[in-house]
Amino acid sequence: MPMMERPAVRDCDGGRCWEHEFPTFLMKVFVPDNDLDGQTNNYGFRAPLLLVFEEEKQDLDSAVSFAKETGLSKIAATYDSSVLFIYPTAEGGWESVDSSLYADVIKEIKMITVYKDGIVEDYNFFTKTFEGFFARGAKFRTDIYSYGKSADYVANNLLKTLEGEYLWGPGEITPAMCSMENLSVVPDVKRKDIAILSVGNSDELNLAFSGCENILFKEKADYVNDYNSFVKKFKMWCGHIELEPDFEALGMTEDVGFVTVKTSPDNEFLPAPADEHKVGYFAYYNNGLFDNGPVPLVIGFHGGGDSSMYLTYVAGWWDVCRKNNFLYVAIENHQFVTATEARDVIEVLKTRYPIDEKRIYATGFSMGSGKTWDLYQEYPEILAGIMPCSALFPVYTTFFGKPVTDRLNKTVSVPVFYSGGYKSHLPELPFQGESCVERVKYVAGVNKLKKSFDDVTFENKDSWEDPVWGVSGDRTEESYDPTRDATLTIHYFDSEDGVCRTAFASVSNQIHECRQHSIENAWKFISQFKKD
């Protein structure tokens, strides 16, 4: 059960702390002070979810002291994050619980952009309902630190594929890293890719880790150095261990910045009304990119329940810009940014980087797809192309759910590559929802497609020519993604002038997510276009 009342937060030496007892476990949270402006530039998707499984139950002050003495608080502060302490409520402690306890813990943790004191408020954008308070953390960066009895619990129960409440619904919640110190049982290793930090364990017990793909043996824990050299490399994204990029080694630069914009009249989502506000961003580019003149810009908008680093690190835009030599700028907290303000951000970026004004592109995932569509609707003249994914929002309302302004684009064609997940629990493809049909018909009209969508309605989907889109493309292409055992099926549609500037794609075996394979194909198509 989520917390329906905000837990009492108190100041403590070096930060803030709070605790809450759930039905199956007690959670204590220490939020160390830091110098980051996390509300402007959100580090959440890079931040580790530091879970300390206490061997014996301790009080809150003792937990805070442990975090500081070990250096876990320093790690958390580096990423504007927290240290979470867990102990079972069951009589008998760790010896009385199984993997369902871990699932219970993960269920009470969410990644939402608005947060304070390590707590997020979950307000469902679609149902307009408040769903509770949750501890803040990135489930796919779960790093577990365990000792003695709790280490035995991890060794017996968590070194395998685990299912539970993932980012946007049911999914895999397997931890990225498990640190086990002073084991007394032989680990039951059913999964070899989970990163293992074995501390102070005998050679005999360590034999159980033979064949593990990612392992570090230590006599004694050195938390900060172990994290920087080993732990921080790993994330468990949708059931697959992935490694973080080393930008220095790759010859890349990451810039952190913000733009102060004038608040537009249609901005009703700011937490507090203001005449102007900050818009944070992270920019990524190859060293030396600007040596030969203006460069293409891709501006990215994240999903509603995540931050800019989702598109950058998880979807992989950093790698696509590295391979294709363009400037990628990921906008932070864009849910507080209107299309007008996004346009203003682009204008400022043009003064900070040598941007080719004829090659400005936009992309977005989920609610970020909505922001990308808003730019298509309101400011098409600034765009050479768009690459939205995983959301086909209604046309005749803005991202904020308000009626569109008189700026609604009806005539300016803009190249589009859109992709959505075939197995998503949200409406991403026309066969999944009426609003999706509305969006596709709108694009067909604005981009002046040769093929007509006029007779396509959601009610008659059982008789559609194409079971996903209603109408088949002029050409169809399939691209297999071996990393996810999925196929991207692309329908290319020609416009009346003979130019193919519209691509609608579906991804088999994909839920509500954004994958690098899809965005690489999107860039391959969209990058051929530039404004006249």
Residue positions per predicted region:
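A domain-start/cap signature at the N-terminus of enzymes
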Residues: 1-49, 97-107, 118-128, 140-147, ...
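Short substrate-entry loop that stabilizes the transition state in hydrolases
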Residues: 36-47, 52-95, 289-295, 300-336, ...
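Alpha-helical scaffolding within the catalytic cores
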Residues: 65-73, 182-189, 309-318, 345, ...
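Short beta-strand/loop motif that positions the catalytic acidic residue
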Residues: 197-199, 418-420
